């Protein structure tokens, strides 16, 4: 039984939408319905045996994708074979999943997917290292032994190996889901069991031993149990780094093959062997759990393997709209089911699937190489500079030289005007598609039951482009259900946007081209576009800015285009008519009069030039013979122009006058169209767009207007902003709105060469309340557009909305510069002439900007995929490397001034950053629009690489000194104190300006004070050129002050070293002797070189020579001990360890540990030298005459203490190496054989081995020799030595978990089999090493082995993967 309340209208289709299961029509008709009929406030029940008989007019599948409004159904009914066959569509998007049902075959049975390519580089794997098989295995980059199946063929015997973290191939959503499922299904249960067992062991020990004991072993055991509990608790929230796969690439004699070790254990026979997709069509899934499909490509030399995965669901959905083919259910087909698809992924995984210049230009090159017919690109961004930039240059070359039809989304930034994006709405030759809402789809696609009128979606971007082009070319249906990648875990998904209208249009065009190709008719982008625009249906009551030339009508367009091509109306190499508009110094592509100061007659010089494709031919006859007699027409009385034009193959100019004062208020659009007198039925052969915005004036400081809120209909108001205004508050009031009504408020004003996203404000108002307000920034003298649109789904009954715009103004500097150290800096501001304002001036600094110089810069040519076919250009790159030291966890953004604000309009191909940790671990990426890419950096050292791509290597050479600006978000904003006068500011007298007001036109000056040094940020040490950035606001109103701001730059000098106490502190007077200072400097230089020499023989000889001159100099002895202790076990010798122990003994003899320990108890952290001298004299019973000697002695104690600790570190480390090697417990091999010992002394890690490693037995034998020597020498040093004495002595000076002691303590714990304590200490040491430039792989490997010993296998796996991810053999490729 089904209960339905408020029965008004129900159909089989809408019923199925609400039902939890799918019903056939017959089942639906037989289902009893319980209707609840509302009558006079009460409900009465009525049982019905069956619903009214409703027969759906079409199956539900037919409503998933609109093919009716564009005439596609009519077209294919008439021409069933013109379904896209023989046409190749390139989908420049997030990649297409080749496993989808609709992507398998065309209507002719051919493979649907021509190729699948990742142009971004995010899936690249360096496979330049080769291995040969030995005993049936090769060693992977991971260190795993990879078993080569016997059935693999490799005539060369060379296997290329690489490494890829699997999470780098996941989208953010997939990664989040996989982590959650792994935690719930695998990691979580295992971890909970381990934590429970650890707590049980601790509780049991507490019961048995109690709180006191005389045995040290009980102390260590208790600590071990407690450490297990603490360690497991800390690991419960650790980030899942995911598995790491070895990649093996080889040539089987016919083609390159690739196997990704998805067993993660070296069992390659369990993995999938794939050939390159273009040749084989092979694809596989990374794992069954994630369902992420991948394909592969390999460079000609095998040194680069591309793992191609979708970076989002968007691309598959778009491809499904354009050309999906379902042989068993044709109603689900895309628009061109017979077409083939070329998947070109331009959405970079590293950037959340945002496009990059690198990806787009590579994609254009592939389109040229593979002879693509149509591009669909459902991507785009706002642009500061329309129709320019390296990406745009390559796009236009592809259109003009290769004849590719380029269809692109216009953007989703509406409803305000001039919001079209690049490239769809701003690029000459690109067909920009707007978004059409069909009333028939509202029920099925959106679940909207109220009547809906077909219209343009409110969010669809509108023209005109800022350079005067109309922006939107055509519109097409913009919502559909289509297939999405299997990792989405659903077969289809509903999406809307111009991203969906563009492939709808592209699919329609593919059908048209399919017919032309089968009839051997040669088209050009120009003829295709002209036929589409001249036959499109202009939707009634919808402005041209929204719909361009109207709805695509493909059947009509095909007939028109066929006629043009058959009659050869245009030369085949005519690419387009170039329109150039000049007005004084401004160049544009159309006439766009918007600002109030243009309100009068304006003259424009307009050039019209036919452009021919001449780059591939010496035949100039088509251009020479080209002649057209043109009639010029327009319908607007405010435009005056010549009536005729004779066009030949050169630019022809004319003068056009536009009188904005004669145009109606609001937005006005017309076109000067060129009609061929020889054949007027063709329609316009070129169009000159003319837009005039005639704004309304404001009465004093307020504008009001009543809007009619029809669902989905945009109400626009254009207002001349008063010259003094800097901000405004817009208020909307509705008295008769529906309780669920929502309104979108969108405001825009235009600045020259600035994208509308920088000057727009958009907010959805409602549904709560009936009055809303929004404060915005405005610019005096500009035209402000304020448009309001009611949600399109609210039905046909309009509501009234009153809009009020109140203007406010405060005249102030647009930018304020302050200098650290300046005691007062005046800042002047003035109230508007029309009203008083309440003021509360303030300066808030929000970020530190640090300027970094490049440490290295290299210009080099890129590989084969960056040799561009259409332009013939070899793309080069400049690789800049910067070093960044972060002292506290920070959030940073990266900027190259003058380059990163741009993408499509960028003068270079691409700017891409990658951030790496100390050991080449990948941390994050950034590119254009730095404010979108915030990286969270922990304390440590980082390497930042910036890649700039450009064809001309000399241009890149000139950029080799570019500074990198690192924007560091301040944890707490810094407020700059303001004073009422210069003298108050200098004297530090801050003024609170609460309750202050300015009369109209009144001026006020405040004085910015200096920031105290202790308030400056310490996250990153500023360099020369660094500054603090923030804003200044004068207004008291919080909403207005948030938008009415001036930029503030506070320039810093480099930090000076500050004393720990006040400047008035009295310190001990030190004797100076210039000759002694010189002698000491020479000695220190020599001593520093002892540790720098890498040749052991030279180092030994130099040390002995220095020792003769400075026999008791502690830094000399320390440096030699460090140098010898940094040696790996494989390089260590009995003679060297003997020397280490000898030197440590010498150090302990010189330093007198007991005396030094006494001093440590006397010297407190904040004591000054004078007080310490008094304490020492009192403790030792010394006299005042000994003061000078004590002062000298005290100055030596810190160096003595440092030397003692180093000596005990070395002795205890050698001592514990013996203990772990003779331990009866299963101590990890990396601990047992000195893998971490060199790390203690600042060296590189030792061997990371296990019992199966080659050389294990030889290393074991050598360790026995070393241990024998160490044991003998330690007994000589301390006759009472039995095994742990030096470690216990070290604990006198440092705690067991001190960073200098942690690794030694870990060895001590491992020797006792106390792996809980060992794990906690290793984890702490690993965190410390990770933040420095020290390789921590040995520590992570040891941690993994310790966890295996404890049977914490989930953590063992984590640390193995972590070791590989944190310690890369090379930087991630760009």
UniProtKB/Swiss-Prot annotation:
Annotated Peptidase S8 domain residues: 62-558
Q: Does the keyword Hydrolase apply?
A: yes
Q: Which GO terms describe its biological process?
A: positive regulation of lipid storage; proteolysis
Concerning InterPro entries, the annotation shows: Peptidase_S8/S53_dom, Peptidase_S8/S53_dom_sf, Peptidase_S8_His-AS, Peptidase_S8_Ser-AS, Peptidase_S8_subtilisin-like, Peptidase_S8_subtilisin-rel, TPP_II_domain, TPPII_C_art
This entry's Enzyme Commission designation comes to 3.4.14.10
Provide the reaction this enzyme catalyses: Release of an N-terminal tripeptide from a polypeptide
Task: Name the catalytic site residues.
Answer: 93 (charge relay system), 314 (charge relay system), 499 (charge relay system)
MF terms from GO for this chain are: aminopeptidase activity; serine-type endopeptidase activity; tripeptidyl-peptidase activity
Q: Which UniProt keywords apply?
A: Aminopeptidase, Hydrolase, Protease, Serine protease
Provide the tissue specificity. Answer: Expressed in intestinal fat-storing cells and some head neurons.
Q: What happens when the gene is disrupted?
A: RNAi-mediated knockdown causes reduced fat storage but does not affect feeding behavior.
Tagged with keyword Ribonucleoprotein: no
Tell me a GO cellular component: cytosol
Role description: Component of the proteolytic cascade acting downstream of the 26S proteasome in the ubiquitin-proteasome pathway. Has a role in regulation of fat storage.
Q: Known PANTHER family for this protein?
A: PEPTIDASE S8, TRIPEPTIDYL-PEPTIDASE 2
Can you tell me which family this protein belongs to? Belongs to the peptidase S8 family.
Query: What protein name is recorded for this chain?
Result: Tripeptidyl-peptidase 2
Source organism of this protein record: Caenorhabditis elegans
């Amino acid at each position: 039984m089904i209960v339905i309340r408020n029965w008004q209208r129900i159909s089989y289709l809408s019923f199925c939408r609400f039902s939890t299961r799918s019903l056939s029509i017959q089942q639906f008709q037989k289902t009893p319905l319980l209707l609840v009929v509302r009558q006079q406030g009460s409900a009465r029940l009525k049982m019905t045996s069956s619903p009214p008989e409703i027969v759906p007019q079409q199956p539900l599948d037919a409503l998933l994708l609109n093919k009716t409004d564009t005439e596609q159904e009519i077209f294919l009914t008439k021409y069933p074979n013109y379904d896209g066959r023989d046409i190749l569509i390139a989908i420049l998007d997030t990649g297409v999943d080749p496993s989808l049902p609709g992507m398998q075959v065309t209507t002719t049975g051919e493979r649907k997917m021509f190729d699948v390519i990742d142009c971004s580089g995010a899936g690249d794997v360096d496979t330049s290292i080769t291995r040969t098989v030995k005993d049936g295995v090769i060693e992977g980059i991971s260190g795993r032994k990879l078993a080569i199946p016997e059935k693999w063929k490799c005539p060369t015997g060379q296997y290329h190996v690489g490494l890829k973290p699997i999470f780098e191939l996941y989208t953010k959503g997939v990664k989040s889901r996989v982590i959650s499922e792994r935690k719930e299904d695998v990691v979580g249960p295992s971890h909970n069991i381990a934590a429970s067992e650890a707590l049980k062991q601790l509780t049991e020990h507490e019961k048995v031993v109690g709180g006191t004991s005389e045995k040290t072993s009980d102390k260590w055991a208790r600590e071990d149990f407690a450490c297990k509990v603490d360690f497991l608790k800390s690991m419960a929230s650790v980030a899942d780094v995911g598995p790491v796969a070895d990649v093996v690439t080889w040539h089987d004699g016919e083609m390159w093959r690739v196997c990704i070790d998805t067993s993660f254990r070296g069992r390659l026979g369990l993995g999938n062997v794939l050939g390159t997709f273009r040749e084989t069509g092979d694809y596989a899934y990374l794992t069954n759990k994630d369902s992420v499909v991948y394909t592969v490509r390999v460079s000609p030399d095998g040194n680069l393997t591309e793992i191609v995965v979708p970076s989002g669901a968007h691309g598959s959905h778009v491809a499904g709209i354009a050309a999906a083919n379902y042989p068993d259910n044709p109603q689900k087909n895309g628009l061109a089911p017979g077409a083939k698809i070329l998947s070109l992924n331009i959405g970079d995984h590293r950037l959340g699937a945002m496009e990059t210049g690198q990806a787009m230009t590579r994609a254009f090159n592939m389109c040229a190489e593979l002879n693509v017919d149509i591009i669909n690109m459902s991507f785009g961004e706002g642009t500061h500079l329309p129709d320019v930039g390296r990406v745009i240059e390559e796009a236009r070359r592809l259109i003009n030289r290769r004849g590719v039809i380029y269809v692109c989304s216009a953007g989703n930034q509406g409803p305000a005007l001039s919001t079209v994006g690049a490239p769809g709405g701003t690029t000459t030759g690109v067909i920009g598609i707007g978004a059409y809402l069909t009333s028939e789809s509202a029920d099925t696609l959106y679940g909207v039951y109220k009547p809906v009128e077909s219209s343009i979606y409110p969010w669809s971007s509108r023209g005109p482009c800022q350079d005067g082009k109309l922006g939107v070319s055509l519109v097409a249906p913009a919502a559909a259900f289509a297939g999405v990648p299997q990792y989405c875990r659903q077969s289809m998904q509903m999406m809307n946007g111009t991203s969906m209208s563009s492939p709808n249009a592209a699919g329609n065009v593919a059908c048209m081209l399919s017919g032309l190709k089968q009839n051997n008719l040669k088209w050009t982008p120009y003829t295709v576009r002209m036929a589409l625009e001249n036959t499109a249906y202009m939707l009634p009551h919808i402005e041209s800015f929204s719909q361009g030339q109207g709805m695509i009508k493909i059947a009509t367009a095909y007939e028109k285009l066929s006629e043009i091509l058959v009659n050869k109306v245009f030369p085949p190499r005519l690419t387009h008519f170039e329109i150039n508009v000049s007005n004084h110094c401004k160049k544009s592509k159309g006439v766009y009069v918007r600002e109030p100061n243009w309100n009068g007659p304006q003259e424009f010089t307009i050039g019209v030039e036919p452009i021919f494709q001449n780059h591939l031919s010496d035949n100039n006859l088509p251009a020479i013979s080209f002649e057209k007699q043109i009639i010029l027409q327009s319908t607007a009385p405010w435009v005056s122009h010549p009536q005729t034009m004779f066009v030949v193959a050169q630019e022809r100019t004319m003068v056009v006058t536009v009188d904005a004062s004669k145009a109606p208020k609001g937005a006005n659009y017309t076109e000067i169209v060129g009609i061929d007198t020889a054949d007027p039925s063709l329609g316009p052969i070129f169009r000159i767009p003319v837009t005039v915005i005639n704004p309304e004036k404001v009465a004093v400081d307020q504008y009001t207007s009543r809007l009619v809120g029809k669902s989905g209909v945009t109400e626009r108001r254009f207002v001349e902003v008063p010259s003094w205004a800097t901000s405004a508050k817009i208020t909307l009031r509705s008295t008769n709105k529906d309780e669920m009504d929502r309104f979108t408020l969108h405001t825009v004003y235009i600045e020259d060469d600035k994208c509308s996203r920088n000057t727009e404000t958009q907010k959805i108002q409602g549904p709560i309340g009936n009055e809303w307000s929004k404060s915005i920034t405005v610019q005096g003298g500009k035209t402000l557009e304020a448009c309001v649109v009611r949600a399109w789904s609210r039905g046909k009954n309009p509501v009234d909305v009153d809009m009020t715009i109140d203007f406010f103004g405060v005249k102030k500097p647009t930018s304020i510069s302050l200098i650290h150290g300046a005691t007062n800096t005046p800042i002047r501001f003035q109230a508007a002439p029309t009203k008083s304002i309440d003021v509360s001036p303030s300066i808030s600094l929000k970020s530190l900007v640090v300027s970094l110089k490049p440490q290295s810069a290299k210009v080099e040519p890129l590989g084969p995929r960056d040799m561009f076919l259409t332009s013939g250009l070899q793309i080069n790159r400049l690789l800049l490397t910067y070093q960044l030291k972060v002292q506290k966890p920070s959030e940073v953004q990266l900027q190259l001034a003058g380059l990163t604000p741009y993408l499509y309009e960028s003068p270079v191909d691409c700017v891409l950053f990658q951030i790496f940790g100390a050991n080449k671990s990948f941390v994050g990426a950034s590119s254009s629009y730095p404010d979108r890419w915030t990286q969270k950096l922990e304390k440590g050292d980082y390497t930042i690489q910036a890649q700039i791509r450009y064809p001309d290597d000399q241009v890149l050479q000139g950029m080799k000194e570019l500074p990198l600006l690192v924007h560091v978000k301040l944890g707490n904003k810094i407020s700059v104190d303001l004073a009422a006068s210069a003298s108050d500011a200098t004297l530090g007298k801050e003024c609170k300006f609460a309750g202050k007001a300015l009369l109209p036109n009144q001026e006020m000056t405040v004085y910015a004070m200096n920031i105290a040094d202790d308030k400056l940020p310490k996250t990153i040490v500023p360099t020369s050129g660094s500054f603090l950035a923030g804003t200044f606001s004068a207004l008291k109103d919080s909403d207005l002050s948030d938008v009415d701001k001036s930029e503030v730059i506070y320039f810093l000098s480099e930090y000076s070293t500050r004393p720990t106490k006040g400047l008035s502190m009295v310190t001990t007077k030190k004797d100076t002797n210039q000759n002694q200072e010189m002698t000491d400097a020479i000695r220190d230089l020599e001593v520093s070189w002892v540790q720098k020499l890498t040749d052991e023989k030279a180092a030994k000889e130099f040390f002995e020579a220095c020792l003769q001159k400075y026999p008791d100099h502690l830094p000399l002895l320390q440096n030699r001990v460090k140098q010898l202790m940094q040696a790996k076990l494989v390089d260590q010798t009995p003679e060297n360890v003997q020397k280490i122990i000898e030197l440590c003994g010498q150090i302990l003899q010189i330093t007198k540990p007991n005396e030094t320990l006494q001093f440590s108890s006397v010297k407190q952290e904040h004591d000054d030298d004078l007080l310490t001298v008094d304490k020492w004299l009192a403790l030792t019973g010394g006299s005042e005459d000994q003061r000078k000697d004590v002062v000298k002695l005290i100055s030596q104690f810190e160096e003595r203490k440092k030397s003692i600790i180093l000596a005990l570190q070395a002795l205890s480390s050698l001592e514990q190496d013996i203990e772990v090697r003779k331990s009866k417990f299963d101590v990890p091999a990396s601990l047992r054989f000195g893998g971490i010992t060199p790390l203690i002394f600042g060296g590189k890690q030792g061997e990371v081995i296990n019992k199966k490693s080659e050389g294990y037995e030889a290393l074991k034998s050598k360790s026995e020799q070393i241990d024998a020597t160490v044991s003998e020498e330690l007994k000589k040093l301390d006759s009472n030595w039995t095994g742990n004495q030096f470690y216990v002595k070290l604990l006198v000076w440092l705690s067991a978990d001190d960073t200098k002691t942690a690794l030694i303590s870990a060895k001590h714990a491992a020797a006792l089999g106390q792996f809980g304590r060992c794990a906690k200490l290793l984890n702490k040491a690993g965190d410390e090493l990770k933040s420095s430039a020290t390789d921590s792989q040995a520590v992570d490997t040891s941690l993994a082995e310790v966890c295996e010993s404890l049977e914490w296998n989930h953590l063992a796996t984590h640390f193995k993967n972590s070791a590989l991810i944190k310690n890369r053999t090379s930087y991630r490729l760009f």
